[in-house]
Amino acid sequence: MSSIDIRHAHSLPHAQARKAVQEVADKLAERFGIDYDWQGDTLNFTRSGVDGKIDLAPQSLRVTASLGFLMSAFKGPIEAEIKRVLDERFGG
C-alpha cells in the first residue's frame, strides 16, 4: 500500500478555505465517484482503492491518503494533480 502526504500553506479566512475544500470535494465526487463527509475541520473521503482526508487548519491544510495496490501505480500523477488543484484554489 502506498501513501500520499501533502502539506499546503494558505492565507484564506477559515470560511473561505472550507468552502474551497468543499468545492474540490464536490468536483471529485462528480468526476471520480468519491464519497466524503466532514468531521469538524476534516474532510474524509473514500473510493475503491483510495482512503484519505483533508485536514483544514489556520494558514495550512494537509492531504493524506492511502492508495490500494492498483492505485499505487498512479501515485505520481495523483500527487501532481492534488498539488495543481491546491495551487489553483489556495495559491502556490
What do the PLM-derived regions correspond to, one by one?
Residues 27-53:
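Ser/Thr-rich, low-complexity intrinsically disordered terminal regions
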